[in-house]
C-alpha cells in the first residue's frame, strides 16, 4: 500500500480508509486497540484519536465509550462527501460515479429551479446573469491572469481556485480557466438550489462540491463544454425572465444529453491525476 499524505493525520486517515476498502479492516469488524493501531500506522495516539473521531463523523466508524471501535457498512452510513473518496479508491468505477453525478443533477434540477424561478425570480435572474457575464469575460480574456485582474469577484475565485504549480504556461492557463469556469457552474446550480426555498437542495450540492470540482476541472478544460454550458445558462435566463417554467425539464434534459455526449468522448482519455487523492 503506497500512501501519499501531507501530514501524519492525513496519512493515518488514508491508511485506515484504504484498509477498510481493501478488506484489511472489513465492514462489521473491530479495529485494533488504539495503542496497537497507532504503532502499526506510525502516529501518536493523540493524532490517531482525532482521525478516528473524524472518520466516525464521516460514517466510516462507530466509536462507543468503553467498547472497541467498529467498522461500519460505510455505504449505509456515509453521506455524499464519500463519493470523492470512492473516486480515489475505486478507480475502475470512477466514470460510473461521474455519470451518476450528471444524471442526478439532471433529475433534480428541474424541481428546484422551478421553485427558484417562481419564489425568487429576481435573485435567480441576478445569479444567472452574473454567471453568464463572468464566464463570457473568462472565455474572452487574453489570459486567466487578465481575467482575474479585472474581475470584481477575484477574491472569491481565488479562495476556491488554487494553482497547481504547473510550469508549462499553456497548461497552467488551461487548468486555471477550467477550474474557474467550474467555479461559476457550481455557483449557478448551488445558488439556484438555495433560491428554491428548500435548503435540502442546496445542501446536496454542498455535499457534492469536492467531487463536482474534480469532475468539472477536467470537463471544462474542453472549449466545447464551456460553449455548451454558456448556451444553457442563456436558455435558463430566458426561461426565468419569461416565466415559462414548464420548459425547464426539456431545457435541462437536453443539456444533460449534450453534456453526456461530450463526457463520453472525454472519458476515453482521462488524465492520470483524475482519480488521485490530492488531500
UniProtKB/Swiss-Prot annotation:
Locations listed in the record: Cytoplasm
Keyword NADP: no
Cellular component per GO, a single term: cytoplasm
DNA-binding region: 34-53
Domain spans labelled HTH gntR-type: 6-74
Pfam families linked to this entry: FadR_C (PF07840), GntR (PF00392)
TM annotation in the entry: none
Single GO MF descriptor: DNA-binding transcription factor activity
GO biological process assignments: fatty acid metabolic process; regulation of fatty acid metabolic process
Predominant subcellular localization, coarse grouping: cytoplasm
SUPFAM superfamilies listed in its UniProt record: GntR ligand-binding domain-like (SSF48008), Winged helix' DNA-binding domain (SSF46785)
SUBUNIT field: Homodimer.
Designated name of the protein: Fatty acid metabolism regulator protein
Species for this entry: Vibrio parahaemolyticus serotype O3:K6 (strain RIMD 2210633)
Taxonomic lineage of the native organism: Bacteria, Pseudomonadati, Pseudomonadota, Gammaproteobacteria, Vibrionales
The gene coding this protein: fadR
Amino acid at each position: 500500500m503506497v500512501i501519499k499524505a501531507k501530514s501524519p493525520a492525513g496519512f493515518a486517515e488514508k491508511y485506515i480508509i484504504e484498509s477498510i476498502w481493501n478488506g484489511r479492516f472489513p465492514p462489521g469488524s473491530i479495529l485494533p486497540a488504539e495503542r496497537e493501531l497507532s504503532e502499526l500506522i506510525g502516529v501518536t495516539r493523540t493524532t490517531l484519536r482525532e482521525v478516528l473521531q473524524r472518520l466516525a463523523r464521516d460514517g466510516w466508524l462507530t466509536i462507543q465509550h468503553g467498547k472497541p471501535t467498529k467498522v461500519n457498512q460505510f455505504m449505509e452510513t456515509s453521506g455524499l462527501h464519500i463519493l470523492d473518496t470512492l473516486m480515489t479508491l475505486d478507480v475502475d468505477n470512477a466514470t460510473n460515479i461521474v455519470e451518476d453525478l450528471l444524471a442526478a443533477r439532471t433529475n433534480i434540477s428541474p424541481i428546484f429551479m422551478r421553485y427558484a424561478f417562481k419564489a425568487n425570480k429576481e435573485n435567480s435572474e441576478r445569479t444567472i446573469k452574473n454567471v453568464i457575464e463572468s464566464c463570457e469575460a473568462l472565455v474572452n480574456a487574453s489570459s486567466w491572469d487578465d481575467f482575474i485582474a479585472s474581475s470584481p469577484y477575484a477574491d472569491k475565485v481565488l479562495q476556491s481556485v488554487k494553482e497547481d504549480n504547473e510550469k508549462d504556461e499553456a497548461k497552467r492557463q488551461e487548468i486555471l480557466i477550467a477550474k474557474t469556469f467550474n467555479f461559476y457552474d457550481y455557483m449557478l446550480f448551488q445558488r439556484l438550489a438555495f433560491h428554491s426555498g428548500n435548503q435540502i437542495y442546496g445542501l446536496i450540492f454542498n455535499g457534492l462540491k469536492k467531487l463536482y470540482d474534480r469532475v468539472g476541472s477536467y470537463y471544462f478544460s474542453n472549449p466545447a463544454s464551456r460553449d455548451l454550458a454558456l448556451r444553457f445558462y442563456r436558455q435558463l435566463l430566458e426561461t426565468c425572465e419569461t416565466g415559462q417554467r414548464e420548459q425547464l425539464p426539456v431545457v435541462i434534459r437536453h443539456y444533460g444529453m449534450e453534456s453526456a455526449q461530450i463526457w463520453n468522448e472525454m472519458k476515453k482519455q482521462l488524465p492520470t491525476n483524475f482519480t488521485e487523492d490530492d488531500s
